[in-house]
Amino acid sequence: PAAGPGPYKLLPRLYFRSLVPQLHLKLHPEIAVETTYFDRHGTVSGGRIDLRPSLSLPFIKRYARIIPKLSLRHTEYFLKDEGAFNDRESRTVPVASLDARLFAERRLSLFGSTMLQTLEPRAYYLYIPKDGQDDIPIFDTGRFGTTFQSLFYENRFAGSDRVGDSNQLT
């Protein structure tokens, strides 16, 4: 059987992430920007710019960490197409999350040995509204595998072409 067109060439891929110094009220602004041009013969090619500004207000103590966060995910596409997509597509999706952890420790004597017992419960709430993304090509996006850590990811997709809707408490 004939091989498919193969993977996209990235010409180039630039990524920038900035943690802005703390503002008053302990707000933590952050911005991530990625720009990539995807090229593959015989199919849709084009550029993508992904902007992810966010603002969080961490509450961090020795016994707890609570981080509410608001983000905006804006992705813009500039396409050279074989007919399936418009020349220009975009998507803007708000993201809200609340990550809460408690840290409890106690000394424990067991069989003559002193140990430190630690309990770290965590609750994570994520809200992302449903957004139709059928008009956007998939250049480099796939689903993450299911792991314990993936329960706390902001997006169930790896890559910038899809943002998974969510209204869940983990």
Where do the language-model regions lie?
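Outer-membrane beta-barrel proteins and related beta-barrel translocases across Gram-negative bacteria
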Residues: 1-170
